[in-house]
Amino acid sequence: MLDLQLEARYHGFIYQEREEVEEIKSITHVFEHEKTGAKLLYFENDDTNKVFSISFRTPPEDDTGVFHILEHSVLCGSRKYPLKEPFVELVKGSLNTFLNAMTFSDKTMYPVASQNDKDFHNLMDVYLDAVFHPLLTEKQSILKQEGWHYELNSVEEPIEYKGVVYNEMKGVFSSPEQILMRSIQKSLFPDTPYRYESGGDPIAIPELTYDQFVKDYQRFYNASNSFIT
């Protein structure tokens, strides 16, 4: 059991709260980073599977799906790992038991898990460098690849929109059930961020500019807006 004192400082974090959670046989420890206000929740238990996640509050302000595109884009190379797709390399070469990134209606989450200590720390390092030092602020091509771009296959064919997220959301919006669910959500929450499609509406995705893309990254992807577990 960890021997920690409430209100004491540990590596720049202030220890704020301790609670036993019998249902998951864990002791939870809550910390707050003194300089940035970042929250950290640590689960103390005997589970051999180690899990790490960093999340950011990302309430959408339109239907462009900027946070969904950012979720994809931060994993397209970073300062320390300048590969085209480090996420794909981790999927192929790490010992992870879970590796993903998810965009919700009001937050974006980057979770990893592994039973191997060295692999676990490497996964954390790659993800932390990805969210705090991504190449997307320098490479407009990342937005074009993951978000949207124009594509012309021949002079006889019309110009089309393409992009990883754009194509993904076209598939989502091809479902009548999804369209109905979106209409219900807009009706239920007309004056909140939940009225917007956080994943991106294919009609609105091409409205996202590179300048706004970078501004939203800088505004929301910072330690003071993060929650770490």
Model-based region annotation:
Residues 64-76:
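Active-site recognition of the HExxH zinc-binding catalytic motif
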Residues 55-65:
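Short pre-active-site segment immediately N-terminal to the catalytic Zn-binding motif
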Residues 34-35, 46, 57-59, 115-116:
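Secondary-structure transition/turn motif
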Residues 2-47:
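N- or domain-start disorder-to-order transition segments that initiate the globular core
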Residues 1-10, 59, 73-82, 86-229:
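Charge-rich, well-structured scaffold segments of protease-associated domains
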Residues 48-52:
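Short, conserved catalytic-motif segment at the N-terminal edge
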